[in-house]
């Protein structure tokens, strides 16, 4: 057949047209040779008639359009997947594709084949990464609650949806092909994919919330249910022939080879590289790509999609660092950000709204009604099972909406079914549209209904001031990102002067950014996987604090945790642990790290966001620690110089009172010099009317301390405005090792006049922001008192007995830890 029969220009890189196939009309594409790159417009050569320029144009238009649509949909909390599908819809036959000239220029048949091939390669790699981030053991950690909800989330829609088909087919009569397509669509609508759910949770910043952890486990259970049903259906409908049995055994053999051959090879190569001296590349990148290609090719040879082998190869490998982290960093950039948008957009390009309207309206309406009924049954089944498990009604509704969210796995399955003619074009269009509609509404409602910060609002007062007034145990939660944070945190603990009569409980939380795994982690240190590189750093942190504990035996009680979550939501773990352990004060590092010469060495924007989120939602008081200790190398706790001089800058307000309460505890340490600098305006010298009597009592107590102890000093600075206040603070120089200050002050105070107009770091307050200047070389602790009603109930669970009459050397004194200490592990698997 000559190309001229197709009615196209012979200068195109490809020619196409319809020919008679064995069963129906099919489209054939003839690709011209030597039409890869254009000679240029100056040589009168149209670049769009050549393969490479056309491919680059297609990718550019798809990526730019998807980003624009995503930006438009952002206020509605829609995901990138929805934006990419809508990109295909806009660029496809539903809208712009009605223009024949545009379609022949932008998406000719030959150009479509090339971009489909490349995008499928990107999708195979992306699915491998999704599998790599899955921890197979998570299904074993799912408690009975997650198993019940996950099973109900699949069983209700699958069974009731098929019953609806049976009822409608008997009462109204539906053709057999419509029944077959709709049954397949029901099985797809009933499933909830674990990778999709974790992606949605991460995008909504609730992956490590209580609801997020429950949804993670439920989605895994639901997906396993869909696997079993699909396997049973496949075995039931498959022809009972030796060929079918041979094909099934080959697929099982591929899975066994992946797990028992490919996996050990990759793990062995990774361990070998990790132990080598070359730390630049700890992952066998090219061997992994080779085995990935073999697994994908084997899947295609056995009659399944190439992504099947890639996905299960990823599942078989250990998630998290080093393998998962390194591979994700190298592959996600071009696979997930470049080729994947093209793959999803092509699914939208295959969607044609006009084919739906032009087809039989009765069948279209029936299919859509059945699909909506299926999603409704999924929602009701999940909500009912959640309510049965005594989940709060708001959380049950949000969980039901989350289980209705679908994404790339479902879109991919629909495309495969369309190519295999399991569903027709009409059903394919309806499924894609319904997924967009249901997922879009569900995501928006979850954002509107669920606020994880409400869970962290404590019903009792947990402040340092309250601890001091009612003789309660001081309980600290220390957030750390690396071992460099340890020495100054140890200095802070030592400055608070733990004794057997006034002990301290503290909890360390190693904060790790989630990379290379899909689900968040909050676990005690002793339960961490020893093969995880984060365990090694956590062990260094724990060992340092354990040395410190040995120094204060009987006066300290500690527990050590590690949290791995996206930085955008890791504040949920901080607040969860603080609430669970009834912490009095959360101490978190400042987002700027200072070099040894005092200048700013590194600025970490995500850590600043964490600090702001913790300040807004914390169930207790919060302190941001500006560390100006030695930052050269990994400091040893044994070599750290303890603080000798501490100052407190007092202006007025609740936060200053909170900082003063902590300062007064430090003043009890015999070998620590403590100075309180009280800023007062000249007009207030004769006015002793304080906004809070507790503030007045604190100052009076400190003055009494200063009168009786030589190492405690009270200094009153008389200033007229903010300029003189700044001059006094600037004169501190290097006289102190650490300075305490409240975050918020009495803004009506004249001593701040002129200072409140500008602030670079509002999370530190006016004075705290001033102390971040490189002119100062001491560490700073900015304290913010617990927010909420002053009438909060007092929690005396950790009340200390009155031992003022006891002597320090009395060995008969019992340890002053509450019998209800509750130093137990957090079982996150049974949510």
Curated annotation (Swiss-Prot):
Subcellular location: Cell membrane
Gene3D superfamilies noted in UniProt: 1.20.1530.20
Pfam family, one: CHX17_C
Upregulation: Transiently induced by K(+) depletion.
Deletion phenotype: No visible phenotype under standard growth conditions, but growth inhibition and leaf chlorosis and bleaching under low K(+) conditions.
Regions that span the bilayer: 50-70, 89-109, 112-132, 147-167, 214-234, 250-270, 282-302, 303-323, 334-354, 364-384, 397-417, 430-450
Major localization listed first in the record, in broad terms: membrane
Membrane topology: Multi-pass membrane protein
Gene Ontology terms: cellular component: plasma membrane
One term of GO molecular function: potassium ion transmembrane transporter activity
Keywords per UniProt: Cell membrane, Ion transport, Membrane, Potassium, Potassium transport, Symport, Transmembrane, Transmembrane helix, Transport
Tissue spec: Preferentially expressed in pollen before and after germination. Detected in pollen grains within anthers of the flower buds or in pollen on fully open flowers and on the stigma, and in pollen tubes growing in the style. Weakly expressed in roots.
A GO biological process held by the record: proton transmembrane transport
Note: K(+) uptake enhanced by a proton electrochemical gradient (acidic outside). Not affected by specific inhibitors of voltage-gated K(+) channels.
Biological role stated in the UniProt entry: High-affinity potassium transporter that plays a role in K(+) acquisition. May operate as a K(+)/H(+) symporter.
Family assignment from sequence similarity: Belongs to the monovalent cation:proton antiporter 2 (CPA2) transporter (TC 2.A.37) family. CHX (TC 2.A.37.4) subfamily.
Identification of the protein by name: Cation/H(+) symporter 13
Classification lineage: Eukaryota, Viridiplantae, Streptophyta, Embryophyta, Tracheophyta
């Amino acid at each position: 057949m000559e190309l001229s029969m197709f009615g196209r220009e012979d200068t195109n890189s490809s020619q196409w047209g319809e020919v008679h196939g064995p069963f129906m009309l099919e489209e054939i594409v003839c690709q011209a040779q030597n039409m890869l790159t254009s000679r240029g417009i100056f040589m009168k050569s149209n670049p769009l008639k050549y393969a490479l320029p056309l491919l680059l144009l297609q990718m550019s238009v798809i990526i730019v359009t998807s980003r624009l649509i995503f930006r438009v949909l952002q206020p509605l909390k829609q995901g990138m997947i929805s934006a990419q599908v809508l990109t295909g819809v806009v660029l496809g036959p539903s809208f712009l594709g009605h223009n024949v000239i545009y379609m022949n220029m932008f998406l000719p048949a030959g150009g479509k084949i090339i971009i489909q091939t490349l995008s499928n390669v990107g999708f195979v790699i992306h699915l491998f990464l999704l599998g790599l981030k899955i921890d197979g053991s998570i299904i074993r950690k799912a408690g009975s609650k997650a198993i019940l909800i996950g099973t109900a989330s699949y069983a209700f829609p699958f069974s009731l949806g098929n019953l609806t088909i049976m009822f409608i087919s008997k009462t109204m009569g539906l053709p057999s092909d419509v029944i077959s397509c709709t049954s397949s669509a029901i099985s797809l609508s009933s499933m909830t994919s674990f990778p999709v759910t974790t992606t949605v949770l991460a995008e909504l910043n609730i992956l490590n919330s209580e609801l997020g952890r429950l949804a993670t486990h439920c989605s895994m259970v639901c997906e396993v249910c869909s696997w079993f049903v699909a396997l049973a259906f496949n075995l039931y409908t498959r022809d009972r022939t030796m060929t079918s049995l041979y094909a099934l055994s080959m697929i099982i053999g591929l899975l066994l080879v992946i797990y028992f051959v490919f996996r050990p090879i990759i793990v062995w190569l990774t361990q070998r590289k990790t132990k080598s001296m070359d730390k630049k590349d700890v992952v066998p990148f090219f061997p992994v790509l080779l085995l990935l290609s073999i697994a994908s090719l084997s899947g295609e040879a056995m009659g399944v999609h190439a992504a099947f082998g890639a996905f299960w190869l990823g599942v078989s490998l250990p998630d998290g660092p080093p393998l998962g982290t390194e591979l994700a960093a190298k592959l996600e950039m071009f696979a997930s950000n470049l080729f994947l948008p093209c793959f999803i957009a092509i699914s939208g390009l295959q969607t044609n709204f006009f084919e739906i309207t032009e087809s039989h309206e009765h069948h279209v309406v029936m299919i859509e009604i059945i699909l909506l009924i299926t999603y409704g049954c999924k929602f009701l089944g999940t909500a009912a099972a959640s309510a049965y498990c005594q989940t709060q009604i708001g959380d049950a509704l949000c969980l039901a909406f989350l289980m209705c969210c679908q994404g790339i796995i479902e879109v991919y399955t629909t495309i495969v079914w369309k190519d295999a003619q399991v569903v027709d074009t009409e059903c394919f269009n309806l499924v894609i549209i319904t997924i967009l509609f249901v997922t879009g509404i569900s995501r928006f409602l979850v954002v509107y209904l669920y606020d994880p910060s409400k869970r962290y609002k404590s019903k009792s007062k947990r402040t340092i001031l309250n601890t001091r007034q009612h003789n309660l145990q001081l309980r600290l939660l220390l957030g750390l990102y690396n071992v460099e944070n340890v020495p100054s945190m140890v200095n802070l603990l030592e400055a608070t002067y733990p004794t057997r009569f006034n002990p301290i409980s503290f909890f360390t939380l190693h904060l790790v950014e989630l990379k290379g795994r899909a689900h968040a982690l909050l676990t005690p240190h002793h339960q961490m996987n020893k093969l995880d590189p984060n365990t090694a750093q956590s062990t260094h942190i724990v060992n340092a604090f354990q040395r410190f504990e040995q120094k204060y035996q009987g006066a300290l009680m500690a527990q050590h945790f590690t949290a791995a979550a996206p930085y955008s939501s890791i504040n949920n773990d901080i607040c969860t642990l603080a609430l669970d352990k009834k912490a009095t004060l959360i101490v978190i590092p400042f987002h700027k790290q200072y070099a040894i010469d005092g200048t700013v060495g590194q600025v970490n924007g995500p850590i600043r966001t964490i600090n702001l989120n913790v300040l807004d939602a914390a169930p207790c008081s919060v302190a941001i620690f500006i560390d100006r200790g030695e930052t050269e190398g990994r400091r040893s706790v044994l070599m750290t110089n303890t603080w000798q001089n501490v100052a407190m800058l007092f202006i007025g307000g609740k936060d200053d009172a909170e900082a003063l309460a902590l300062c007064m505890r430090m003043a009890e340490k015999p070998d620590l010099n403590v100075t309180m600098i009280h800023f007062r305006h000249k007009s207030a010298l004769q006015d002793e009317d304080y906004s809070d009597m507790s503030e007045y009592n604190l100052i009076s107590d400190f003055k009494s301390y200063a009168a009786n102890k030589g190492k405690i000093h009270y200094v009153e600075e008389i200033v007229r405005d903010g300029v003189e206040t700044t001059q006094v603070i600037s004169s501190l120089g290097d006289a102190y090792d650490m300075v305490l200050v409240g975050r918020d002050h009495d803004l009506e105070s004249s001593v701040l006049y002129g200072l409140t107009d500008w602030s670079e770091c509002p999370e530190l307050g006016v004075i705290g922001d001033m102390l971040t200047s490189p002119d100062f070389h001491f560490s700073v602790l900015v304290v913010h008192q617990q927010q909420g009603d002053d009438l909060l109930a007092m929690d005396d669970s950790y009340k200390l007995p009155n031992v003022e009459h006891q002597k320090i050397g009395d060995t008969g004194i019992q340890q002053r830890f509450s019998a209800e200490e509750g130093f137990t592990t957090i079982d996150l698997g049974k949510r």
